[in-house]
Amino acid sequence: MNSPIQPNTSRSDEEDFSADYPRHKHPAIRVVMMPRDTNALGTIFGGVILSEIDLAAAIEAHRYHSGRIATVAMDTIEFKRPVFVGDLVSFFTETTRVGTTSVTVKVSVWAQRRFGSHVRVPVTEASVTMVAVGEDGQKVPLERREPVDID
């Protein structure tokens, strides 16, 4: 019997996704999930994943604005598969819209299963809208319409 924190990595439905892993892209964030991140079921708490999605979207949005950035919406969030303790989770970002004051970012979350396998599976996808704000917390125009590298 499988423990909730030790995934059955021999499942064929997970093995099929490794070919789709975005190898050509560099993740905004990579995190190993720890026991402190679990929910009552023993899998990773969705709020932990949402927090990292928010950070990844902010990193992408800062390519358009070096000042303050605030999250205004998480429009779409789809939890596709559970994340387990020990999974190496990668958060990939892609700008989908640049407005006058805001940037919309797609965040694709992948987990590399750590218990005896190199299986990679898509676990979550989200669309996040970030807005540039001034010292007073009000919207301000983005500094640029084209991204810059912030590595």
Region annotations inferred by a language model:
Residues 2-11, 17-19, 23-29, 84-88, ...:
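HotDog/MaoC-like acyl-thioester-processing domains
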Residues 47-67:
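Active-site helix/loop of acyl-thioester processing domains in fatty-acid/polyketide metabolism
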